[in-house]
Amino acid sequence: MKKFLTLLLAAFVAVSALSFTACGNKKDENKIYVGMECGYAPFNYTQTDSSNGAVKISNANGYANGYDVMIAKKIAEKLGKELVIVKYEFKGLIPAVQSGALDFIIAGMSPTAERKESIDFSDAYYQSQLVIVVKKGSKFASATNLDGFKGAKIAAQIGTFHNDALQAQAAAHGILAQTPMATFPILIGALKAGTIDGYVAEYPGAKADCTMNDTLTFVNLQNNTTGFTATDEDVQIAIGLKKGSEYLTSINAALAEISQSERDQMMQTATENAPKEG
């Protein structure tokens, strides 16, 4: 009986993670439900109030802000719907869209070939470089290419292209690829503690992390030359939707109205407004 109750409780907890919008008849058709981690600055992060246009997180404490939130607000406005931000672990985002719990993923997600097998993606709304964040003063801080990280213990976030690239390419450069970690705050903590020598991030994320943490810096690698081998789709950021979603055309139309200069300004603002951790 005890084992049965334990299994039942585990099942209840798993279902509860999706219960907010898991049943289609519980979703308000006047709202769009957008999933993100709320912990991947400057794309998305959590703050304590609604300043700078932040949106209340529907299923957790705090308010969401960042580049992804700015994009989500423009999409909601274009669709004439109220924006609902739902916090998810990164690995749970695709299943949530597939189940209908979420309408969209706007979470700094790359439209990789593997992910396209599971969900559809919009046109790209950002494109970046993969870099490596290290401690200031570290012997690896002066590296100019991946070979400069020989012997370094480098990690990345689980379920990301960052980790795919690291695991596939580390050995060729003498890098010691570590077990992937769940979130960027965990990666930052591991780096500060000396458990790892660095972690893979995208340029804007690395810039924000180093702005928030003044003991960190990053090595500005360039894809396919001094850095990781990557295709355009690997380092593009796009909106994830359920296969065959009716929203795809409207989302692409909304994105097309956002100029490159406006996107650059949005990213700069998101980076500047990210909470400083010290």
Task: Describe the role of every protein-language-model region.
Residues E29-G108:
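Extracytoplasmic small-molecule ligand-binding "clamshell" domains
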Residues K73, E77, E82-G148, T225-T231:
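Acidic, polar ligand-binding/catalytic clefts
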Residues F161-M181, N252-G278:
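Ligand-binding clefts/hinges and TM-proximal coupling segments of bilobed small-molecule sensing domains
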Residues Q127-V134, N213-L255, E272-G278:
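Periplasmic-binding protein-like
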Residues G24-K26:
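Bacterial signal peptide processing site
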Residues S19-A22:
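C-terminal motif of bacterial Sec signal peptides marking the signal peptidase cleavage site
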Residues K91-G92, G108-S118, D164-Q169, K192-A193, ...:
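A ligand-binding cleft/hinge motif common to bilobed small-molecule-binding domains
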Residues C38-A41, N61-E77, M109, Q129-P185, ...:
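Bilobed "Venus flytrap"/periplasmic-binding protein-like clamshell domains
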